[in-house]
């Protein structure tokens, strides 16, 4: 697990006190002993206590680095100086430790703000001095192999960050704004515990409907919802139910966000003309059994997907609509005949992510998907989207304030 250990400092070079969640984890203690060369004194702490220790340590580290930069900023504030490199690493480490999905670097006239997106909302991390913006952005662009000389145009890139406990794929996006460049990093941990349908906490009836859909020999299964509503997570959880079978699974994504062992993952590149439709045509020549399409964006992709679903392939895809019923209208707008759509359809799911109440505080911790599962005959499995969201309120998982935030008053 990510937060099972917090290492103290060795005062004499021979003995180190270490906070651990499990003092009987001999493999962990032996690894720390080998890496540090010290005799280890384990001190048992809860996971939450260790998280607080890690947050405080990261804060102290970044403050010390800033003091170091402040003291010599005129001579050593370049992007390749150790303090700048360490500060960037410290910010990334803190974001991963706090479970953030995105980091926002935002310049204004007085400061360079850093914010973390956690459980769907942005939270202030800290305000850095404005002069540090340029070396931090250059450092991030170098990591992502983006052009450091051009600040007037947006840039995209990616890199891998190895933290103390977690490795993450990082997607970078920059945008010219009034006071410089805004940068957003999307964090995609590579060693998260793989979620299954059981982990997603659906009702028993909806969970079984998912399993039936993913076991179908052919047809079209859609998941709809806005960006960031967990559509890919749900599709991957379903694929993990079947990927061990003797089948050929291929995904077409933009971009590939998570590694799915046992699947052939294809990343489209529209700048080079390798679109979803182009990729889908090629995949159909690869003898696929199951095809996941990251998003049906255009008429051509929709037409090919429907034909594939009618010719012996299980096709899983996402759409951007507000409800399951709106998916048919969206496909009609893309030129799909209603009769053809209904003949191929296995089911449509719409979902939203709601923050979960934290029993240890008055706030929230983690998120859960509220879903509706629409059958081909137009009936719902276990209620529509808002009914299932209200069920989560009755069960004490979330509250009405969160319902109002996500669905509106």
Locate each region found by the language model.
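Polyanionic, low-complexity intrinsically disordered segments
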Residues: 1-35, 155-164, 169-175
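Core recognition of P-loop NTPase motor domains used across DNA-transaction enzymes
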Residues: 2-11, 27, 31, 38, ...
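Charged, low-hydrophobicity low-complexity segments
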Residues: 44-93, 98
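Short glycine/Trp-rich loop-beta-loop segment that forms part of the substrate-binding cleft
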Residues: 17-60, 201-212
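Long, low-complexity, intrinsically disordered polar/charged segments
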Residues: 6-16, 70-73, 283-289, 308-310
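Short, flexible helix-loop junctions that flank or precede catalytic/ligand sites
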Residues: 81-94, 98-409
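Generic amphipathic alpha-helical segments used as scaffolds and interaction surfaces in large
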Residues: 19-20, 41, 78-82, 394
